[in-house]
């Protein structure tokens, strides 16, 4: 089961906060970094008016821990643009965050990897989308859509 391998199945059935349940199941460097994102998103779901702030806090923590920045061909190439877009357009923050994350992930195709395993492969991964950026954009897109649907139900 793909969800079990990714640690996602641990979240709904755990007494732990989502980020801790995910980290406990996945481990590794990417598990730690994605657990930060999941924690920020959990807070963002509870308070969608500050979604951009939660994404910004997550990107700052991930950048510090991973010693990476936007342009290094990492998950930050989707996360940072999403956070900025959400903050810059509060009225449409969810839609803007989702679009910016997807665009940021697409841009990694032409970037040489400066961090992670991809920096060791031929051409530093140029020509391929960064998997962390892609995963981040998919997570953000899914969550933004979920929040939008829940907000519509509440009306």
Region annotations inferred by a language model:
Residues 1-155:
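N-terminal loops that bind phosphate or other acidic moieties
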